[in-house]
Amino acid sequence: MKSLGVYLKHYKKESIIAPLFKLLEVVFDLLVPMVVAQIIDVGIAGNNRPYIVSRFGILVLMASVGLCCSFTAQYFAAKASVGCATELRQAVFDHIQALSFTELDTIGTDTLITRLINDINQVQNGINMGLRLLLRSPFIVFGSVVMAFTVNVKCAIVFLVTIPILFVAVFGIMLVSIPLFKKVQAALDRVTGMTRENLNGVRVIRAFCREEQSVADFEKSNDELTRLNEFVGKISALLNPLTYVLINIAAVVLIWQAGLQVNIGSMQQGQVVALYNYMLQIIVELIKLASLIITLNKSVACAERVSGVLAVPTTMNYPAKGGAAKKVTGDAAVTFKNVSFTYAGAGAESLSDISFTAKRGQTIGIIGGTGSGKSTLVSLISRFYDATSGDVMVDGENVKNYTKEELCNKVGVVQQKAVLFKGSIRDNMKWGKEDATDAEIWEALTTAQAKEVVEGKQDQLDFMLEQNGKNLSGGQKQRLSIARALVKKPEILILDDSSSALDFATDAKLRKAVHNLEENTTTFLVSQRIAGIRQADQILVLGNGTLEGNGTHDELMKTCEVYREIYFSQFPEERAAYNNESGVIA
């Protein structure tokens, strides 16, 4: 929580001016009943029209000044709250960008979206209301009691008795309801997460005819949220009727006591009206204060959740100064030395004691069953994750010695799921290289077999993509994603099963084009299909996180049982020939 105060400190002036102008408004609010009392006791009682008009003018003037004070307070409170929320949102977003995939996996996407949007909006609302009302309500209550004593001491005692009872009623309800609001927020998070998951996976849900189950699951979570909201609502609903009953009882006592004072001549009718108005001001402000405290408690809870995200330390630390990229030694592009890796919270290792060397310019194929660790292995090269033990070397230097920019410039990654951003094709291609020329973009598109795709669009490079490239097919998105990585001409290119949506002919052309890249480009091909990696200079065979085999296709057919089984599962007609020849299948 203290860490969030830093952002409000940037708006010290606004945070001081807003409450001050609210206090000025309160002063005029407290004077209004006294002026009304004078109009009744002097103007109306004495049939003094000029006096009534003059006091009416004073009321209009006070209302105008109070309105100006209110507008000023609102302006500065809004400026402080919006500015603080904007800086806080930016800080959280910047911090998220600095987190490694390990922290992102632990926190979860749904949680981060909720913190960035809902929680920070709640913090903004709390700051706004706090600056405007946190001092106003107590000051009105205290000021009304003081003003009541200036009118009549005996009647003011009714205020002293009523206010503590009102406080107990109002804040008693709050003490019960505030903890429940945290449960409501947690239930809302679950509903939000389920909504996002269902919307993202709506095609899968319909493909498996799981609509009814999804509706049932959502209904269960939604009913839980509704139940909590209704329970809290019932408790909170007691606030207004209970306080109004108390205030009406107090008003009856006040009027009775004031009537006695009027009968003996120690009070005038206008003063009775003033006391009643002060009583009404107190109840209104107590209800406002109760609502404010509920809002502030929600804001504090949300602020703690946001602060929790900011407090998550990143395990991915980069050196402040570069230079590792210049220290190229030997012909080894990528080296794994006894590398093991375990995902946060996982019981078993995803990779265990992996060692191999990929020379500069080689094509490395990676194959294995589902969950064997293929994507995890290549993620360590680009340092999406850090190895639990062992060393990952790029050009003879540990990846931890590279700055983020150096490693990003050296390694190009195309992941399994093709992600394109809203904007033109040219804009998306320049993610790989900001100053890329059209010629460089077309060269990359040609290599990625995407030239025909772009040429077929009316605006070609200026063709506007929808969010996540929804106006393209799966294969088109994959080819554009590959082209985006190729634009910057990376020294290490990682294709993580990124051609799964391509037809066989296009995939073959792509493999050939990638194989003909510049001599110093080292390519990692992750694939489920042996045809996609058969011609690789080196093939890594993974099984349950261990390196089961390493070599060329011919070598692995002789030495690696796992590789042979994968091969024969995809080419069953070759098994008989292999058994007959007991040799290598060309």
Sequence positions of predicted segments:
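Membrane-integrated ABC transporters
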Residues: 1-29, 36, 44-59, 65, ...
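An intracellular "coupling" helix at the cytosolic face of ABC transporter transmembrane type-1 domains
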Residues: 10-13, 98-102, 118-131, 135, ...
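Helix-loop-helix
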Residues: 47-57, 147-161, 175, 231-304, ...
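Transmembrane helices of ABC transporter permease
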Residues: 10, 14-27, 38, 58, ...
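Pre-NBD coupling/linker segments of ABC/ABC-like ATPases
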Residues: 314-329
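ABC-type nucleotide-binding domain
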Residues: 327-586
